[in-house]
Amino acid sequence: MASMITVDFENCFIFLLLCLFSRLSYDLFFRKTKDSRAGCALPPSPPSLPIIGHLHLILFVPIHQSFKNISSKYGPLLHLRFFNFPIVLVSSASTAYEIFKAQDVNVSSRPPPPIEESLILGSSSFINTPYGDYSKFMKKFMVQKLLGPQALQRSRNIRADELERFYKTLLDKAMKKQTVEIRNEAMKLTNNTICKMIMGRSCSEENGEAETVRGLVTESIFLTKKHFLGAMFHKPLKKLGISLFAKELMNVSNRFDELLEKILVEHEEKLQEHHQTSDMLDMLLEAYGDENAEYKITRDQIKSLFVDLFSAGTEASANTIQWTMAEIIKNPKICERLREEIDSVVGKTRLVQETDLPNLPYLQAIVKEGLRLHPPGPVVRTFKETCEIKGFYIPEKTRLFVNVYAIMRDPDFWEDPEEFKPERFLASSRLGEEDEKREDMLKYIPFGSGRRACPGSHLAYTVVGSVIGMMVQHFDWIIKGEKINMKEGGTMTLTMAHPLKCTPVPRNLNT
Protein backbone atom coordinates (compact mmCIF):
# COMPACT_ATOMS: atom_id res chain seq x y z
CA MET A 1 0.00 0.00 0.00
CA ALA A 2 1.95 2.53 -0.90
CA SER A 3 1.38 6.21 0.36
CA MET A 4 -1.10 7.97 -2.51
CA ILE A 5 -0.17 11.76 -2.77
CA THR A 6 -2.10 13.75 -5.37
CA VAL A 7 -1.63 17.26 -6.74
CA ASP A 8 -3.25 19.27 -9.57
CA PHE A 9 -0.82 22.08 -10.36
CA GLU A 10 -3.16 23.84 -12.75
CA ASN A 11 -5.65 24.55 -9.96
CA CYS A 12 -2.83 25.79 -7.71
CA PHE A 13 -1.24 28.19 -10.21
CA ILE A 14 -2.79 31.34 -8.74
CA PHE A 15 -1.54 30.41 -5.29
CA LEU A 16 1.94 29.88 -6.66
CA LEU A 17 1.99 33.35 -8.21
CA LEU A 18 0.99 34.88 -4.88
CA CYS A 19 3.98 33.19 -3.28
CA LEU A 20 6.53 34.55 -5.74
CA PHE A 21 6.96 37.91 -4.06
CA SER A 22 7.28 36.31 -0.62
CA ARG A 23 9.84 33.87 -1.92
CA LEU A 24 11.90 36.63 -3.55
CA SER A 25 11.80 38.72 -0.38
CA TYR A 26 12.96 35.77 1.67
CA ASP A 27 15.87 35.08 -0.68
CA LEU A 28 16.96 38.72 -0.70
CA PHE A 29 16.64 39.62 2.96
CA PHE A 30 16.52 36.52 5.16
CA ARG A 31 18.20 33.56 3.56
CA LYS A 32 21.84 32.93 4.44
CA THR A 33 24.16 31.63 1.78
CA LYS A 34 25.55 28.15 2.42
CA ASP A 35 28.89 26.92 1.17
CA SER A 36 28.61 24.12 -1.36
CA ARG A 37 30.29 20.84 -0.64
CA ALA A 38 33.72 20.92 -2.26
CA GLY A 39 34.40 18.37 -4.95
CA CYS A 40 30.82 17.07 -5.10
CA ALA A 41 28.37 17.53 -7.92
CA LEU A 42 24.62 17.29 -7.79
CA PRO A 43 22.86 15.23 -10.48
CA PRO A 44 22.27 17.02 -13.81
CA SER A 45 19.58 19.67 -13.80
CA PRO A 46 17.48 21.10 -16.67
CA PRO A 47 17.49 24.87 -17.24
CA SER A 48 15.47 26.60 -14.52
CA LEU A 49 13.77 29.94 -13.96
CA PRO A 50 14.51 32.42 -11.18
CA ILE A 51 12.57 31.85 -7.96
CA ILE A 52 10.26 29.04 -9.16
CA GLY A 53 13.05 26.77 -10.42
CA HIS A 54 11.63 23.97 -12.58
CA LEU A 55 7.99 24.40 -11.60
CA HIS A 56 7.04 25.68 -15.05
CA LEU A 57 7.99 22.31 -16.56
CA ILE A 58 5.17 20.46 -14.79
CA LEU A 59 2.33 22.98 -14.52
CA PHE A 60 0.13 22.08 -17.46
CA VAL A 61 0.74 18.37 -18.05
CA PRO A 62 -0.05 15.49 -15.64
CA ILE A 63 2.85 15.17 -13.24
CA HIS A 64 3.87 11.62 -14.23
CA GLN A 65 3.90 12.58 -17.91
CA SER A 66 5.80 15.81 -17.19
CA PHE A 67 8.51 13.96 -15.30
CA LYS A 68 8.68 11.28 -17.99
CA ASN A 69 9.14 13.96 -20.68
CA ILE A 70 11.81 15.75 -18.63
CA SER A 71 13.73 12.52 -18.08
CA SER A 72 13.52 11.56 -21.75
CA LYS A 73 15.13 14.88 -22.65
CA TYR A 74 17.66 15.39 -19.84
CA GLY A 75 18.42 11.95 -18.39
CA PRO A 76 17.22 9.29 -15.93
CA LEU A 77 18.72 10.87 -12.78
CA LEU A 78 18.03 14.57 -12.29
CA HIS A 79 18.11 17.24 -9.62
CA LEU A 80 15.05 19.52 -9.74
CA ARG A 81 14.03 22.51 -7.67
CA PHE A 82 10.53 23.86 -7.07
CA PHE A 83 11.07 27.16 -5.28
CA ASN A 84 13.31 26.06 -2.40
CA PHE A 85 12.17 22.44 -2.59
CA PRO A 86 14.89 20.05 -3.93
CA ILE A 87 13.93 16.78 -5.59
CA VAL A 88 15.97 13.94 -7.03
CA LEU A 89 13.97 12.50 -9.92
CA VAL A 90 14.67 8.87 -10.83
CA SER A 91 13.23 7.44 -14.05
CA SER A 92 15.62 4.54 -14.64
CA ALA A 93 15.00 0.98 -13.46
CA SER A 94 18.69 0.35 -12.80
CA THR A 95 19.11 3.57 -10.80
CA ALA A 96 15.99 2.88 -8.75
CA TYR A 97 17.23 -0.65 -8.07
CA GLU A 98 20.61 0.70 -6.91
CA ILE A 99 18.93 3.18 -4.55
CA PHE A 100 16.60 0.61 -2.99
CA LYS A 101 19.46 -1.87 -2.65
CA ALA A 102 22.27 0.36 -1.37
CA GLN A 103 20.26 3.16 0.29
CA ASP A 104 17.15 1.30 1.45
CA VAL A 105 17.40 2.39 5.09
CA ASN A 106 18.42 5.91 4.10
CA VAL A 107 15.29 6.36 1.95
CA SER A 108 12.88 4.45 4.18
CA SER A 109 11.23 7.58 5.55
CA ARG A 110 8.67 9.77 3.89
CA PRO A 111 8.41 13.56 4.02
CA PRO A 112 7.53 14.96 7.49
CA PRO A 113 3.84 15.58 8.26
CA PRO A 114 2.47 19.11 7.76
CA ILE A 115 0.34 19.02 10.93
CA GLU A 116 1.45 16.63 13.66
CA GLU A 117 -1.92 16.16 15.38
CA SER A 118 -3.96 15.42 12.24
CA LEU A 119 -5.15 11.86 11.59
CA ILE A 120 -4.53 12.66 7.91
CA LEU A 121 -0.86 13.06 7.01
CA GLY A 122 -0.06 13.42 10.72
CA SER A 123 2.69 11.93 12.86
CA SER A 124 0.45 9.02 13.92
CA SER A 125 -0.02 7.89 10.30
CA PHE A 126 1.63 4.57 9.44
CA ILE A 127 2.18 5.70 5.85
CA ASN A 128 3.91 8.95 6.83
CA THR A 129 5.70 7.94 10.01
CA PRO A 130 9.52 7.87 9.86
CA TYR A 131 11.09 4.45 9.61
CA GLY A 132 11.52 3.13 13.15
CA ASP A 133 9.94 1.08 15.93
CA TYR A 134 6.36 2.11 15.15
CA SER A 135 6.57 1.52 11.39
CA LYS A 136 8.24 -1.87 11.91
CA PHE A 137 5.72 -2.95 14.56
CA MET A 138 2.70 -1.90 12.52
CA LYS A 139 3.95 -3.50 9.31
CA LYS A 140 4.57 -6.77 11.17
CA PHE A 141 1.13 -6.53 12.79
CA MET A 142 -0.64 -5.90 9.48
CA VAL A 143 1.14 -8.76 7.74
CA GLN A 144 0.21 -11.15 10.55
CA LYS A 145 -3.37 -9.99 11.08
CA LEU A 146 -4.54 -8.51 7.78
CA LEU A 147 -2.31 -8.69 4.72
CA GLY A 148 -0.14 -11.81 4.94
CA PRO A 149 -1.02 -15.11 3.19
CA GLN A 150 -2.48 -16.74 6.31
CA ALA A 151 -4.45 -13.63 7.24
CA LEU A 152 -5.85 -13.35 3.71
CA GLN A 153 -6.89 -16.98 3.81
CA ARG A 154 -8.81 -16.34 7.05
CA SER A 155 -10.65 -13.38 5.49
CA ARG A 156 -11.33 -15.04 2.13
CA ASN A 157 -15.06 -15.49 2.82
CA ILE A 158 -15.43 -11.77 3.47
CA ARG A 159 -14.12 -10.92 0.01
CA ALA A 160 -16.20 -13.70 -1.59
CA ASP A 161 -19.36 -12.25 -0.02
CA GLU A 162 -18.51 -8.76 -1.22
CA LEU A 163 -17.74 -10.04 -4.72
CA GLU A 164 -21.15 -11.72 -4.86
CA ARG A 165 -22.81 -8.53 -3.63
CA PHE A 166 -20.98 -6.60 -6.36
CA TYR A 167 -22.11 -9.12 -8.98
CA LYS A 168 -25.75 -8.74 -7.87
CA THR A 169 -25.45 -4.95 -8.02
CA LEU A 170 -24.14 -5.12 -11.58
CA LEU A 171 -26.79 -7.67 -12.55
CA ASP A 172 -29.54 -5.43 -11.17
CA LYS A 173 -28.22 -2.48 -13.18
CA ALA A 174 -27.90 -4.70 -16.25
CA MET A 175 -31.52 -5.81 -16.02
CA LYS A 176 -32.56 -2.16 -15.74
CA LYS A 177 -30.21 -1.20 -18.61
CA GLN A 178 -28.52 1.35 -16.36
CA THR A 179 -25.09 2.83 -16.99
CA VAL A 180 -22.39 2.00 -14.45
CA GLU A 181 -19.55 4.30 -13.47
CA ILE A 182 -16.96 1.61 -12.87
CA ARG A 183 -14.74 3.51 -10.43
CA ASN A 184 -17.62 4.55 -8.16
CA GLU A 185 -18.98 1.02 -7.89
CA ALA A 186 -15.48 -0.39 -7.39
CA MET A 187 -14.90 2.16 -4.60
CA LYS A 188 -17.99 0.88 -2.79
CA LEU A 189 -16.76 -2.70 -3.17
CA THR A 190 -13.23 -1.99 -1.94
CA ASN A 191 -14.49 0.22 0.89
CA ASN A 192 -16.85 -2.49 2.16
CA THR A 193 -14.15 -5.13 1.81
CA ILE A 194 -11.58 -3.15 3.78
CA CYS A 195 -14.15 -2.29 6.47
CA LYS A 196 -15.18 -5.91 6.98
CA MET A 197 -11.60 -7.13 7.03
CA ILE A 198 -10.63 -4.56 9.66
CA MET A 199 -13.65 -4.35 11.94
CA GLY A 200 -15.87 -7.29 11.06
CA ARG A 201 -18.64 -5.30 9.40
CA SER A 202 -19.12 -2.97 6.49
CA CYS A 203 -20.06 0.65 6.93
CA SER A 204 -23.82 1.01 6.80
CA GLU A 205 -25.39 2.42 3.65
CA GLU A 206 -28.74 2.89 5.41
CA ASN A 207 -27.58 5.42 8.01
CA GLY A 208 -25.14 7.16 5.67
CA GLU A 209 -22.03 5.82 7.39
CA ALA A 210 -20.59 4.34 4.19
CA GLU A 211 -21.20 7.51 2.20
CA THR A 212 -19.59 9.52 5.01
CA VAL A 213 -16.46 7.36 4.89
CA ARG A 214 -16.21 7.59 1.10
CA GLY A 215 -16.67 11.36 1.27
CA LEU A 216 -13.99 11.73 3.94
CA VAL A 217 -11.61 9.56 1.92
CA THR A 218 -12.18 11.74 -1.16
CA GLU A 219 -11.60 14.92 0.85
CA SER A 220 -8.48 13.45 2.45
CA ILE A 221 -6.99 12.60 -0.93
CA PHE A 222 -7.79 16.07 -2.25
CA LEU A 223 -6.07 17.68 0.73
CA THR A 224 -2.84 15.92 -0.10
CA LYS A 225 -2.63 18.21 -3.14
CA LYS A 226 -2.31 21.20 -0.86
CA HIS A 227 0.07 19.32 1.41
CA PHE A 228 2.43 18.65 -1.49
CA LEU A 229 2.28 22.31 -2.47
CA GLY A 230 2.89 23.59 1.05
CA ALA A 231 5.82 21.21 1.47
CA MET A 232 7.63 22.86 -1.45
CA PHE A 233 8.77 25.64 0.81
CA HIS A 234 11.21 25.84 3.68
CA LYS A 235 10.60 27.97 6.74
CA PRO A 236 9.12 30.56 7.00
CA LEU A 237 7.18 30.13 3.73
CA LYS A 238 6.37 26.50 4.52
CA LYS A 239 4.37 27.64 7.54
CA LEU A 240 2.49 30.09 5.33
CA GLY A 241 1.65 27.41 2.75
CA ILE A 242 0.47 24.91 5.36
CA SER A 243 -1.53 27.49 7.31
CA LEU A 244 -3.68 28.14 4.24
CA PHE A 245 -5.21 24.68 4.46
CA ALA A 246 -4.67 23.70 8.12
CA LYS A 247 -8.25 24.52 9.11
CA GLU A 248 -9.69 22.43 6.28
CA LEU A 249 -7.35 19.54 7.05
CA MET A 250 -8.23 19.54 10.74
CA ASN A 251 -11.94 19.74 9.91
CA VAL A 252 -11.76 16.52 7.91
CA SER A 253 -9.49 14.96 10.53
CA ASN A 254 -11.93 15.81 13.34
CA ARG A 255 -14.87 14.34 11.42
CA PHE A 256 -12.87 11.16 10.83
CA ASP A 257 -11.96 11.16 14.53
CA GLU A 258 -15.61 11.43 15.60
CA LEU A 259 -16.65 8.54 13.35
CA LEU A 260 -13.74 6.30 14.33
CA GLU A 261 -14.14 7.00 18.05
CA LYS A 262 -17.71 5.66 17.85
CA ILE A 263 -16.43 2.52 16.13
CA LEU A 264 -13.68 2.04 18.72
CA VAL A 265 -16.13 2.44 21.62
CA GLU A 266 -18.49 -0.05 19.95
CA HIS A 267 -15.70 -2.62 19.76
CA GLU A 268 -14.49 -1.95 23.30
CA GLU A 269 -17.98 -2.62 24.63
CA LYS A 270 -18.12 -5.84 22.60
CA LEU A 271 -14.75 -6.95 23.98
CA GLN A 272 -15.88 -6.31 27.56
CA GLU A 273 -19.00 -8.38 26.95
CA HIS A 274 -17.52 -11.34 25.05
CA HIS A 275 -13.85 -11.25 26.15
CA GLN A 276 -12.54 -12.53 22.82
CA THR A 277 -11.04 -10.93 19.73
CA SER A 278 -12.60 -11.56 16.34
CA ASP A 279 -11.12 -8.99 13.95
CA MET A 280 -8.12 -6.75 13.45
CA LEU A 281 -9.62 -3.82 15.35
CA ASP A 282 -10.22 -6.03 18.38
CA MET A 283 -6.57 -7.09 18.26
CA LEU A 284 -5.39 -3.48 18.00
CA LEU A 285 -7.52 -2.48 20.98
CA GLU A 286 -6.18 -5.45 22.91
CA ALA A 287 -2.62 -4.30 22.16
CA TYR A 288 -3.61 -0.73 23.08
CA GLY A 289 -4.72 -1.89 26.54
CA ASP A 290 -1.79 -4.26 27.13
CA GLU A 291 0.91 -2.66 29.30
CA ASN A 292 3.32 -5.44 28.29
CA ALA A 293 2.69 -5.16 24.54
CA GLU A 294 5.65 -5.32 22.14
CA TYR A 295 4.93 -1.71 21.18
CA LYS A 296 2.63 0.62 23.08
CA ILE A 297 0.35 2.03 20.38
CA THR A 298 -1.86 5.05 20.92
CA ARG A 299 -5.52 5.57 20.18
CA ASP A 300 -4.66 8.10 17.48
CA GLN A 301 -2.33 5.60 15.81
CA ILE A 302 -5.20 3.10 15.59
CA LYS A 303 -7.45 5.75 14.04
CA SER A 304 -4.77 6.95 11.64
CA LEU A 305 -4.18 3.38 10.50
CA PHE A 306 -7.86 3.18 9.55
CA VAL A 307 -7.55 6.42 7.59
CA ASP A 308 -4.46 5.08 5.81
CA LEU A 309 -6.14 1.79 4.93
CA PHE A 310 -9.35 3.47 3.78
CA SER A 311 -7.50 6.00 1.63
CA ALA A 312 -4.81 3.81 0.08
CA GLY A 313 -6.68 0.50 0.06
CA THR A 314 -9.87 1.69 -1.59
CA GLU A 315 -8.72 4.25 -4.15
CA ALA A 316 -5.73 2.39 -5.60
CA SER A 317 -7.66 -0.83 -6.25
CA ALA A 318 -10.68 1.04 -7.64
CA ASN A 319 -8.48 2.99 -10.07
CA THR A 320 -6.72 -0.20 -11.18
CA ILE A 321 -10.05 -1.96 -11.79
CA GLN A 322 -11.25 0.99 -13.88
CA TRP A 323 -8.06 1.26 -15.97
CA THR A 324 -7.81 -2.49 -16.55
CA MET A 325 -11.45 -2.82 -17.58
CA ALA A 326 -10.97 0.08 -20.00
CA GLU A 327 -8.01 -1.74 -21.59
CA ILE A 328 -9.97 -5.00 -21.82
CA ILE A 329 -13.01 -3.34 -23.41
CA LYS A 330 -10.69 -1.57 -25.87
CA ASN A 331 -9.15 -4.89 -26.90
CA PRO A 332 -11.87 -7.42 -27.86
CA LYS A 333 -9.34 -10.17 -28.67
CA ILE A 334 -7.83 -9.92 -25.20
CA CYS A 335 -11.32 -10.00 -23.68
CA GLU A 336 -12.23 -13.10 -25.68
CA ARG A 337 -9.04 -14.93 -24.75
CA LEU A 338 -9.62 -14.14 -21.07
CA ARG A 339 -13.19 -15.42 -21.24
CA GLU A 340 -12.05 -18.64 -22.84
CA GLU A 341 -9.56 -19.17 -20.03
CA ILE A 342 -12.14 -18.45 -17.31
CA ASP A 343 -14.83 -20.60 -18.94
CA SER A 344 -12.45 -23.54 -19.26
CA VAL A 345 -11.19 -23.33 -15.66
CA VAL A 346 -14.17 -21.96 -13.73
CA GLY A 347 -17.12 -22.66 -16.00
CA LYS A 348 -20.16 -20.47 -16.47
CA THR A 349 -22.30 -21.37 -13.48
CA ARG A 350 -20.33 -19.84 -10.60
CA LEU A 351 -18.30 -16.74 -9.90
CA VAL A 352 -14.54 -16.61 -10.18
CA GLN A 353 -13.07 -17.15 -6.72
CA GLU A 354 -9.68 -16.29 -5.25
CA THR A 355 -8.75 -19.97 -5.22
CA ASP A 356 -9.13 -19.97 -9.02
CA LEU A 357 -6.55 -17.23 -9.59
CA PRO A 358 -3.42 -19.47 -9.56
CA ASN A 359 -5.02 -21.47 -12.40
CA LEU A 360 -5.79 -18.35 -14.47
CA PRO A 361 -2.37 -17.16 -15.70
CA TYR A 362 -3.78 -14.92 -18.45
CA LEU A 363 -6.00 -13.11 -15.94
CA GLN A 364 -2.97 -12.61 -13.69
CA ALA A 365 -1.00 -11.29 -16.66
CA ILE A 366 -3.80 -8.83 -17.49
CA VAL A 367 -3.80 -7.45 -13.94
CA LYS A 368 -0.01 -7.07 -14.02
CA GLU A 369 -0.13 -5.34 -17.38
CA GLY A 370 -2.86 -2.99 -16.16
CA LEU A 371 -0.65 -2.02 -13.23
CA ARG A 372 2.38 -1.63 -15.49
CA LEU A 373 0.67 0.87 -17.78
CA HIS A 374 -1.36 2.55 -15.04
CA PRO A 375 0.50 2.29 -11.71
CA PRO A 376 -1.19 3.77 -8.62
CA GLY A 377 1.43 6.49 -8.16
CA PRO A 378 5.09 7.40 -7.71
CA VAL A 379 7.38 6.44 -4.85
CA VAL A 380 8.05 9.52 -2.71
CA ARG A 381 10.69 9.29 0.02
CA THR A 382 13.27 11.45 1.81
CA PHE A 383 17.03 11.00 1.96
CA LYS A 384 17.67 10.94 5.70
CA GLU A 385 21.42 11.37 5.29
CA THR A 386 23.82 12.66 2.68
CA CYS A 387 24.85 9.96 0.21
CA GLU A 388 26.24 9.30 -3.25
CA ILE A 389 24.20 7.90 -6.15
CA LYS A 390 25.85 7.08 -9.49
CA GLY A 391 28.77 9.31 -8.48
CA PHE A 392 26.53 12.29 -7.65
CA TYR A 393 26.17 14.02 -4.30
CA ILE A 394 22.70 13.85 -2.71
CA PRO A 395 22.22 16.21 0.27
CA GLU A 396 20.31 15.09 3.33
CA LYS A 397 16.58 15.87 3.46
CA THR A 398 16.35 15.90 -0.34
CA ARG A 399 13.09 14.38 -1.58
CA LEU A 400 13.32 11.26 -3.72
CA PHE A 401 10.75 10.94 -6.49
CA VAL A 402 10.84 7.57 -8.28
CA ASN A 403 8.68 7.92 -11.39
CA VAL A 404 7.26 4.41 -11.51
CA TYR A 405 5.19 5.42 -14.55
CA ALA A 406 8.33 6.12 -16.60
CA ILE A 407 10.25 3.08 -15.33
CA MET A 408 7.49 0.70 -16.36
CA ARG A 409 7.34 2.29 -19.82
CA ASP A 410 11.10 2.31 -20.34
CA PRO A 411 11.79 1.06 -23.91
CA ASP A 412 15.17 -0.28 -22.75
CA PHE A 413 13.33 -2.85 -20.63
CA TRP A 414 9.92 -3.23 -22.26
CA GLU A 415 9.07 -4.13 -25.84
CA ASP A 416 6.31 -1.87 -27.21
CA PRO A 417 6.04 -0.17 -23.80
CA GLU A 418 2.98 1.93 -24.67
CA GLU A 419 0.95 -1.10 -25.79
CA PHE A 420 -1.34 -3.21 -23.58
CA LYS A 421 0.20 -6.67 -24.04
CA PRO A 422 -0.54 -9.10 -21.18
CA GLU A 423 1.39 -11.81 -23.03
CA ARG A 424 4.67 -10.21 -21.92
CA PHE A 425 4.00 -11.51 -18.41
CA LEU A 426 3.23 -15.01 -19.65
CA ALA A 427 6.70 -15.02 -21.20
CA SER A 428 8.33 -13.76 -18.00
CA SER A 429 6.61 -16.45 -15.96
CA ARG A 430 8.59 -19.05 -17.91
CA LEU A 431 11.84 -17.68 -16.51
CA GLY A 432 13.47 -19.32 -13.54
CA GLU A 433 12.09 -18.12 -10.21
CA GLU A 434 15.25 -16.22 -9.25
CA ASP A 435 15.61 -14.65 -12.71
CA GLU A 436 11.98 -13.53 -12.66
CA LYS A 437 12.34 -12.08 -9.17
CA ARG A 438 15.43 -10.08 -10.12
CA GLU A 439 13.83 -8.87 -13.36
CA ASP A 440 10.76 -7.69 -11.48
CA MET A 441 12.91 -5.92 -8.87
CA LEU A 442 14.57 -4.01 -11.67
CA LYS A 443 11.71 -2.92 -13.86
CA TYR A 444 8.32 -3.85 -12.33
CA ILE A 445 7.58 -1.88 -9.15
CA PRO A 446 3.91 -0.76 -9.17
CA PHE A 447 3.82 -0.89 -5.36
CA GLY A 448 7.28 0.49 -4.68
CA SER A 449 10.33 -1.39 -3.48
CA GLY A 450 12.44 -1.86 -0.39
CA ARG A 451 11.36 -2.10 3.23
CA ARG A 452 8.72 0.62 2.82
CA ALA A 453 7.08 -0.97 -0.21
CA CYS A 454 3.30 -1.25 0.01
CA PRO A 455 2.50 -4.24 2.28
CA GLY A 456 -0.94 -4.60 0.69
CA SER A 457 0.23 -5.56 -2.80
CA HIS A 458 -0.89 -9.21 -2.50
CA LEU A 459 -4.35 -8.13 -1.36
CA ALA A 460 -4.56 -5.70 -4.29
CA TYR A 461 -3.65 -8.40 -6.82
CA THR A 462 -6.23 -10.71 -5.24
CA VAL A 463 -9.10 -8.22 -5.14
CA VAL A 464 -8.45 -6.76 -8.59
CA GLY A 465 -7.98 -10.20 -10.15
CA SER A 466 -11.21 -11.66 -8.79
CA VAL A 467 -13.23 -8.53 -9.62
CA ILE A 468 -11.91 -8.26 -13.18
CA GLY A 469 -12.47 -11.99 -13.66
CA MET A 470 -16.09 -11.76 -12.52
CA MET A 471 -16.86 -8.67 -14.62
CA VAL A 472 -15.50 -10.27 -17.80
CA GLN A 473 -16.92 -13.72 -17.03
CA HIS A 474 -20.52 -12.63 -16.58
CA PHE A 475 -21.02 -9.41 -18.53
CA ASP A 476 -20.50 -7.78 -21.88
CA TRP A 477 -19.79 -4.06 -21.58
CA ILE A 478 -21.33 -1.46 -23.87
CA ILE A 479 -19.88 2.04 -24.06
CA LYS A 480 -21.41 5.20 -25.43
CA GLY A 481 -19.64 6.64 -28.43
CA GLU A 482 -17.04 5.10 -30.69
CA LYS A 483 -14.21 4.56 -28.21
CA ILE A 484 -13.10 4.96 -24.62
CA ASN A 485 -11.36 8.20 -23.71
CA MET A 486 -8.08 7.06 -22.13
CA LYS A 487 -6.84 10.55 -21.23
CA GLU A 488 -4.95 10.55 -17.95
CA GLY A 489 -5.87 12.85 -15.09
CA GLY A 490 -3.49 15.57 -13.99
CA THR A 491 -2.72 14.23 -10.54
CA MET A 492 0.08 12.24 -8.94
CA THR A 493 -2.37 9.41 -8.39
CA LEU A 494 -2.98 8.07 -11.88
CA THR A 495 -6.69 8.48 -12.62
CA MET A 496 -8.81 8.59 -15.76
CA ALA A 497 -9.61 12.19 -16.69
CA HIS A 498 -12.98 10.93 -17.96
CA PRO A 499 -14.43 8.18 -15.72
CA LEU A 500 -15.29 4.92 -17.46
CA LYS A 501 -19.06 4.64 -17.87
CA CYS A 502 -20.61 1.64 -19.57
CA THR A 503 -23.70 -0.56 -19.52
CA PRO A 504 -23.39 -4.20 -18.40
CA VAL A 505 -25.17 -6.89 -20.42
CA PRO A 506 -25.52 -10.33 -18.78
CA ARG A 507 -23.80 -13.20 -20.61
CA ASN A 508 -25.69 -15.87 -18.67
CA LEU A 509 -28.10 -15.88 -15.74
CA ASN A 510 -27.34 -19.27 -14.24
CA THR A 511 -24.90 -18.09 -11.57
Swiss-Prot record:
Its main location: membrane. It is a single-pass membrane protein. The chain crosses the membrane at residues 12-30. Keywords: Heme, Iron, Membrane, Metal-binding, Monooxygenase, Oxidoreductase, Transmembrane, Transmembrane helix. Disruption phenotype: Increased levels of thalian-diol in roots. It is found in: Membrane. Its EC number is 1.14.-.-. Expressed primarily in the root epidermis. Belongs to the cytochrome P450 family. Constitutes with three contiguous genes an operon-like gene cluster that is involved in the thalianol pathway. This is Cytochrome P450 705A5. It comes from Arabidopsis thaliana. The gene is CYP705A5.
